[in-house]
Swiss-Prot record:
Sorted UniProt keywords: ANK repeat, Nucleus, Repeat, Transcription, Transcription regulation
Predominant subcellular localization, coarse grouping: nucleus
Function text: Transcription regulator; part of the Fg3_54/C64 gene cluster that mediates the biosynthesis of the octapeptide fusaoctaxin A, a virulence factor that is required for cell-to-cell invasiveness of plant host. Positively regulates the expression the Fg3_54/C64 gene cluster.
Pfam families, A to Z: Ank_2
Entry-linked SMART domains: ANK
Compartment(s): Nucleus
Name this protein carries in UniProt: Transcription regulator FGM4
GO cellular component, one term: nucleus
Inactivation phenotype: Produces significantly smaller lesions and fewer spikelets with blight symptoms on susceptible wheat cultivars.
Biased composition (Basic residues): 18-31
Description of what induces expression: Expression is induced during infection of coleoptiles of wheat seedlings. The fusaoctaxin A gene cluster is silenced by H3K27 trimethylation by the histone methyltransferase KMT6.
Location of the region described as Disordered in the Swiss-Prot/TrEMBL record: 17-36
PROSITE patterns registered for this protein in UniProt: ANK_REP_REGION, ANK_REPEAT
Length: 266
């Protein structure tokens, strides 16, 4: 038997053909397994929810539409990503459109310069720090020192633009306006003037002084009354705001001011 096997001669050409066929077969099997794994992975990805990615894209688009680039202006992304007990106040962080800003300011406000348009009142990328993202991350209960305009390390207080200041303080003299522009008061002054009720509530909860006066000698209730923010006036009164002096100094063309003066004198 062994001699018979030894006598059989295998053609080298046939051997190469056989080896090639085996190699091709092995390659096809490997490729099939790889394709199957890829299809399984793709099917798994296809079943994943896309809401997170959609939300992220919408956020980026929103930021891009605000300042013309994909770069977040002054920490806007940090504000959006912040998850804290102050999220309710964050809902009042509205400054991206003319409509929202105009509705907050009211329609009866005056300007010194008639050429100032409503578009100029809109917060731009440079004005985004009116309420920095730190307003929702760096506050702690009773932290009144960090909410005071006298604190040199104030993180929540920043100057308003000139057109905005003209609307907030239409009855202020130009001299006082210049002082006020450089030292606009505490964050509570700004929130009260802008009509941001939830921000006002948050600032008071975390220690803001409702009777603090700014460089022009006015407290938050003065600006809330001047701009007809009734709910904020009521809240400030509830929290102990001293309204008698402030309200008497307000231009009585404001219906709210007239009502409060009537209450004072009766």
């Amino acid at each position: 038997m062994d001699s018979l096997l030894n006598s059989i001669t295998i053609d080298p050409a046939e051997r190469r053909k056989t080896q090639n066929r085996l190699a091709k077969r092995k390659s096809r099997i490997h490729a099939g397994k790889q394709q199957g794994a890829m299809e399984a992975a793709n099917a798994l990805v296809g079943r994943q929810p896309t809401s997170v990615f959609t939300s992220t894209q919408q956020t980026i688009k929103g930021i891009t539409s605000m300042n013309g680039s994909a770069e977040p202006p002054n920490g806007a992304v940090r504000l959006i990503q912040t998850a804290s007990p102050l999220n309710e106040a964050a809902e009042d962080y509205s400054h991206t459109t003319s409509a929202s800003s105009s509705s907050t300011m009211g329609t009866s406000l005056q300007t010194w310069h008639s050429h100032v348009s409503s578009d100029e009142i809109t917060y731009t990328g440079q004005d985004m720090n009116l309420y920095p993202s730190s307003i929702f991350t760096n506050l702690s209960p009773g932290s009144s020192s960090s909410l005071s305009m006298q604190d040199s390390n104030v993180i929540l207080c920043s100057p308003m633009t000139s057109p905005m200041t003209r609307h907030v303080m239409p009855s202020c003299s130009k001299d006082n306006y210049g002082v006020q522009r450089s030292k606009p008061g505490s964050p509570l002054h700004i929130a009260s003037a802008m009509g941001h009720l939830k921000v006002v509530k948050t600032l008071i909860t975390y220690g803001a002084n409702v009777n603090e006066v700014d460089a022009a000698g006015y407290s938050p209730i003065h600006y809330a009354t001047r701009n007809n923010h009734t709910a904020i006036v009521a809240l400030l009164l509830e929290k102990g705001a001293d309204w008698s002096y402030n309200v008497r100094s307000i231009d009585t063309s404001s219906g709210l001011a007239e009502a409060l003066i009537h209450i004072i004198e009766t």
